[in-house]
C-alpha cells in the first residue's frame, strides 16, 4: 500500500467502525447496522478493504464484545471476504460514466445480501432451526437493509469525491 493512502485507511476504517457500532433493532431478536464492505472496497481497493474490515471486526469482538469471538471467523469471511468481493465486482466492471453510481449501489446491495445469505446458511449448518416465516421476514429485512446500504454508500462516496477526490 502506498504511504500516501495510509490516512485513507485510518479514516475510512474509523468511519466504518463507528457506523457499525450504531445498531438498530429489526425484530426477531436481531439488529441491523451499516456493513461498510462496499464503502471500503471502493475507497481502498479490495485487498486493503479486507484487511481494514478484519481489523474492525477483531476490535469489535475482542474489546466491545460485539459480534462475538466465536463468530469472528464467520464474520470475517462474510464481511471482509465475501462482502468485499461482492461489493467490488460490480464497481470494477462498471466504474465509469453513468454506470458508476449504480455500480456502487449494486455492490453495496450485493455485499449485504452475500453476508446475509452466508450468515443464514452458517446458522442452518450449525443446527439452528428457522421456520419459513422467520426466513421470509429475515429476507425482507435484509433487502431493506441492502437498499439502505446502497443509498448510504453512494451518498458517502459522492461526498468523498467532492471533498477528497484522490481518495476515491
Residue ranges of model-derived segments:
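Membrane-interfacial segments
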Residues: 2, 63, 67, 71, ...
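Alpha-helical membrane-inserting segments
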Residues: 19, 23, 59, 63, ...
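Short helix-perturbing small/polar motifs within transmembrane alpha-helices
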Residues: 77-119
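Interfacial aromatic-anchored transmembrane helix boundaries in multi-pass membrane proteins
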Residues: 21-29, 55-85
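Alpha-helical transmembrane segments and their cytosolic interface
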Residues: 1-9, 133-168
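Hydrophobic alpha-helical transmembrane segments
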Residues: 6-11, 35, 50-54, 77, ...
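Hydrophobic transmembrane alpha-helices
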Residues: 1-39
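Alpha-helix C-terminal capping segments
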Residues: 39-48
Amino acid at each position: 500500500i502506498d504511504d500516501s493512502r495510509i490516512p485513507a485507511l485510518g479514516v475510512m476504517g474509523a468511519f466504518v467502525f463507528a457506523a457499525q457500532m450504531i445498531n438498530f433493532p429489526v425484530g426477531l431478536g436481531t439488529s441491523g447496522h451499516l456493513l461498510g464492505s462496499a464503502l471500503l472496497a471502493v475507497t481502498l481497493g479490495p485487498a486493503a478493504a479486507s484487511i481494514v474490515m478484519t481489523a474492525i471486526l477483531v476490535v469489535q469482538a475482542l474489546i466491545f464484545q460485539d459480534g462475538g469471538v466465536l463468530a469472528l471467523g464467520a464474520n470475517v469471511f462474510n464481511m471482509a471476504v465475501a462482502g468485499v468481493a461482492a461489493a467490488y465486482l460490480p464497481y470494477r466492471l462498471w466504474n465509469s460514466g453513468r454506470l458508476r453510481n449504480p455500480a456502487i449501489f449494486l455492490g453495496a446491495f450485493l455485499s449485504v445480501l452475500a453476508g446475509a445469505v452466508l450468515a443464514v446458511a452458517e446458522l442452518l449448518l450449525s443446527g439452528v432451526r428457522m421456520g419459513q416465516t422467520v426466513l421470509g421476514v429475515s429476507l425482507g429485512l435484509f433487502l431493506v437493509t441492502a437498499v439502505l446500504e446502497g443509498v448510504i454508500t453512494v451518498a458517502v462516496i459522492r461526498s468523498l469525491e467532492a471533498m477528497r477526490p484522490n481518495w476515491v
